[in-house]
Amino acid sequence: MTFAFRMLAAGAVAGLATGLIPGEQAESQQLPRVVIQTELGDIEVEIDSIHAPVTAANFLRYVDLGFYRFGRFHRTVRADNQPNDKVKITVVQAGLDPYRVKDFPPIPLERTKDTGLKHKDGTISMARDGPNTATSEFFICIGDQPALDYGGKRNPDGQGFAAFGRAVLGMDVVRKFNQAPAEGQQLEPAIRIENIVRKR
């Protein structure tokens, strides 16, 4: 085996290890990453500023200004606390400390049919009410959640939610949050975010 071929083979194996083909791997290496630092552990998230530029820029603005400092994971949605929902999902949701900082104006909804991103295990996405109402609240998926994509029925308008990245480390922490004590869907107590900081 020639040296050049060995190098190519090693690159292919590395791509398989990450679940990315070489082109996607190079693209991934260019994307911003942040670390969500919480009182119970860290979650490293890759932000897809290429496919969801508006949503990514909005999230990173809150990060860069330190607005998520002392925020909280406050909601868990799991099998045992959504008895009246026909469409079930599994996520944890977080946001700012509303007594410390205020939201910027809402942003346009970047639909998954346009971005090509899907709500897979570890996807980070923006919480919203109606279309074009997302501000700072975000959630992380536990397991694949196609009901949150465009055309899904978790929100009756069928527009889905704006996925904009994925957790690359710390899903064990996310799952811990999902199973933490809750009153209905509200975590009791909420889990404090120490800060969210850029890694690259």
Where are these regions (language model features)?
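Bacterial N-terminal signal peptides
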Residues: 4-19
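Cyclophilin-like peptidyl-prolyl cis-trans isomerases
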Residues: 19-200
